[in-house]
Amino acid sequence: MALLKFSPRFFLRTASLFLAAALTAGTPGPKLLPEADESSSSAPVRNIIIDPGHGGVKPGAKGKFGTLEKDVTLAVSLKLKALIEKTMPFRVILTRDKDLDVSLESRAAVANNNDAQVFISIHANGSVRSKSHGAETFFMNVNASDEETRKLAYLENTGEELEKRIADEAQDAVKMILWDMAQAAYVRQSQRLAEMVQEDLNLELGLENRGIKQAAFKVLQGVACPAILVELAFISNPEEERKLGDESYQQRLAESIHRGLVRYLRLFPQK
């Protein structure tokens, strides 16, 4: 009897879908955006997932003048979606397109359920130091680049209800094994995508270059494609908060991320 052969990408997709199902089993989730309808064309549909951070009852960081991270991330994500769909042969799927509370695991599931080529999570930074400023871009690694990055990942991850933490140690071990497999396949592409987006943010906007970093952001875990998390600027810095709330500046942020993505796709063309 002939043995069936599966590609590494098929295996990673299957493993990631199993992970997403394991993490969300038994927990009622929010109504997600529908999966893409591919019936209208015989050509393969290529999807980019944009993830506006936070939402709903989880506003994220809040600025001195009342600007909310969840509003900034959605505004920039919508502008980025429009740019990509206007200039690239990709369909863009948002993990949320309104003020919704979407779990971190469900955001990853949106990427895997739609066979994403790229996953970009958009955030605005916060700090107890109001003078902290600049942009930084992250890709997934279980070991954080430094202590400050480890603390940031912890704050982003524990934004979820604490009761959702995994209690079953065996399930937790499976989660890390599956992610290590996905990480091995996509870490190089994720790093290059992070580098290019970070370079264009700094080049266009003159932001302090806080560099690219690695950390165990929960929203990136289990995503079976190149994945990054972008911290646009510090909403806790009054000067940067004013900029983040300005629609023209949001457009410039979206254009900068778009340019980095274009350069990445030239380096790693999608089949």
Ranges and model annotations:
Residues 1-3, 113:
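General N-terminal leader/first-domain-start detector
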Residues 2, 9, 21-22, 37-38:
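N-terminal and secondary-structure boundary signal
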Residues 3, 27, 271:
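Basic/polar, cationic surfaces and motifs that engage anionic cell-wall
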Residues 6-16:
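N-terminal export leaders
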Residues 14-25:
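Bacterial N-terminal signal peptides
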Residues 30-171, 184-195, 199, 255:
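Catalytic-core regions of hydrolytic enzymes
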Residues 173-177:
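Short, basic/glycine-rich phosphate-binding loops at helix/coil junctions
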Residues 178-271:
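Active-site-adjacent mobile loop/cap segments within catalytic or ligand-binding domains
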